[in-house]
């Protein structure tokens, strides 16, 4: 018995212990051979022999189980040590993303007007002639339509050339007073250093009872907005023409590159054109069924603002997905 237990305790691996198990407990093992002898033992002695053999088997099984647990634990410990990971080592650090400079600029513009209680309105990019042109005082064959090279679909419809149709849809669905901006993508057939076929605009509209909205209000809010975007710049309004506003104006800021002294960027004028605005033409209000109201509207190109804020010379580079350029704006 002691020799058999010693065999179990001397096993130094699970493989060796398995061989001992087969030798002791297998069908042809030592214990099986002892139980086979019972048939030759006389009746009176058989009971005592069986009891002694069962006790021996139980003791050996307990010794085997205990040794198995010890060896199993040692094997697991060895495996864990061999597969250990030094958690103090730095892993692969994922680079953080960032907003595209156009979207960052768009968000900054929207934040300004939302703080002044302007609603943010959206509309479809595929428009019809009425919302994109006719309701904005651009009837068929109006020469001003040539100012915007339009993408037309074969059957009907077009890609909107500005976000002004959102203003028309809002006025058709809402009664005055209205304070809204319409940010979004617009499309024109143009591609050069300062134009792309798809770009982004933010247009604004304020409508109220006649006499409550004036050009002075428009100048005040746009001057404050431009100084919010570009810092302490001078702002000037120049007479201009837009079919949907009368009077109309182009808005310039003193050149942020030369501080108004004159440079190549501002064509040595000291000024940079940034947006257009004006008092809403009565024909626009007539198209949406408004009476006895007045209002002002303005519109700006987000890419133009992004180029000025980040001093980007070529508009097209904003849409080429060049990581070397974009990672500079994190």
From Swiss-Prot:
One of the GO BP terms on file: phenylalanyl-tRNA aminoacylation
Cofactor dependence: Mg(2+)
Residues the record lists as binding Mg(2+): 246
EC number annotated for this UniProt entry: 6.1.1.20
Signal peptide as annotated in the record: none
Keyword hit for Cell inner membrane: no
Class of the enzyme per the UniProt entry, highest EC level: ligase
GO molecular function annotations of the record: ATP binding; magnesium ion binding; phenylalanine-tRNA ligase activity; tRNA binding
Cellular location(s): Cytoplasm
Cofactor binding summary note: Binds 2 magnesium ions per tetramer.
Family matches, as Gene3D superfamilies: Bira Bifunctional Protein, Domain 2
InterPro entries, sorted: aa-tRNA-synth_II (IPR006195), aa-tRNA-synth_II/BPL/LPL (IPR045864), Phe-tRNA-synth_IIc_asu (IPR004529), Phe-tRNA_ligase_II_N (IPR004188), Phe_tRNA_ligase_alpha1_bac (IPR022911), Phenylalanyl-tRNA_Synthase (IPR002319), tRNA-bd_arm (IPR010978)
Recorded GO CC terms: cytoplasm
Record keywords: Aminoacyl-tRNA synthetase, ATP-binding, Cytoplasm, Ligase, Magnesium, Metal-binding, Nucleotide-binding, Protein biosynthesis
Catalytic activity: tRNA(Phe) + L-phenylalanine + ATP = L-phenylalanyl-tRNA(Phe) + AMP + diphosphate + H(+)
One Pfam family it belongs to: tRNA-synt_2d
Keyword presence, Ligase: yes
Subunit record text: Tetramer of two alpha and two beta subunits.
Family statement drawn from the similarity comment of this UniProt entry: Belongs to the class-II aminoacyl-tRNA synthetase family. Phe-tRNA synthetase alpha subunit type 1 subfamily.
Protein name: Phenylalanine--tRNA ligase alpha subunit
Gene designation: pheS
């Amino acid at each position: 018995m002691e020799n058999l237990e010693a065999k179990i305790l001397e096993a130094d691996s699970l493989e060796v212990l398995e061989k001992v198990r087969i030798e002791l407990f297998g069908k042809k093992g030592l214990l099986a051979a002892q139980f086979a002898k019972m048939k030759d033992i006389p009746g009176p002695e058989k009971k005592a022999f069986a009891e002694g053999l069962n006790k021996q088997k139980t003791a050996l099984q307990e010794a085997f189980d205990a040794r198995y647990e010890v060896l199993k634990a040692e094997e697991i410990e060895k495996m864990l040590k061999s597969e250990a990971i030094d958690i103090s080592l730095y892993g692969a650090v994922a680079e953080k993303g960032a907003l595209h400079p156009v979207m960052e600029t768009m968000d900054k513009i929207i934040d300004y007007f939302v703080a002044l209680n302007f609603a943010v309105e959206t509309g479809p990019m595929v428009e019809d002639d009425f919302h994109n042109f006719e309701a904005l005082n651009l009837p068929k064959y109006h020469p001003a339509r040539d100012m915007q090279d339009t993408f037309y679909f074969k059957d009907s419809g077009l890609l909107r050339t500005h976000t002004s149709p959102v203003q028309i849809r809002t006025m058709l669905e809402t009664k005055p007073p209205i304070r809204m901006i319409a940010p979004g993508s617009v499309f024109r057939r143009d591609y050069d250093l300062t134009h792309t076929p798809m770009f982004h605009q933010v247009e604004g509209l304020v409508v109220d009872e006649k006499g409550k909205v004036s050009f002075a209000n428009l100048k005040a809010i746009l001057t404050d907005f431009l100084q919010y975007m570009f810092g302490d710049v001078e702002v000037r309004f120049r007479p201009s023409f837009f079919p949907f506003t009368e009077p109309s104006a182009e808005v310039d800021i003193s050149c942020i590159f030369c501080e108004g002294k004159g440079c190549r960027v501002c064509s040595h004028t000291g000024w940079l054109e940034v947006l257009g605005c004006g008092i809403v033409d009565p024909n626009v209000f007539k198209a949406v069924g408004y009476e006895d109201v007045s209002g002002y509207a303005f519109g700006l190109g987000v890419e133009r603002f992004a180029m000025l804020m980040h001093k980007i010379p070529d508009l097209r580079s904003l849409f080429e997905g060049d990581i070397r350029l974009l990672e500079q704006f994190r």
